[in-house]
Amino acid sequence: LIGPFMDLIIELALTKPFTELAPVSKKGLDEREHEELVTRFFAYSDGLEGYRDRPSEFIFNYVKGMNEKVATQPELTEQYRIRFTETMVFVENAFPYGFRRSQKGKATPRARFEAIAVGSRLAIDQNPALLQQNLHNVAGWLDGDDFARVTGSDGANAIARLRERTGFVRDRLLGV
């Protein structure tokens, strides 16, 4: 899929701090995993209307629609760039290992990325003041059994599981 929104995804997939927060293997780089993660961030944080437990189809349709939308509303490019950058800086400040499971982790599990990235964005959307806060309390739940359960790969693409993991992070960040 080529178009102005896809160009933005490719651009953002190469930026810091994202590439440092979300390490992927050489194979993952070759398979454009960073672009996949950026695309999932936007697709899932924009809402899951039309999602039917088939991420590839949902994401394809999302990017196709956004390419058309950005072509007629080019100002959206900067809005989406800011949204992504803001979220990555927030994750860098709030989550000690970024999207990794541990400090020395060399991989970014998709379910973990979705939970943290999308959950953070949803929390920021509800309470923009989070961007100015210093959050020190994530380690307690980040390393807990509940977070491990919601980010497990079992049925990870089911919409209920996707909502559960993104909602888990959103609610913890909002103190719900």
Question: Which stretches of residues belong to each language-model region?
Answer:
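Solvent-exposed functional surfaces
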Residues: L1-R149
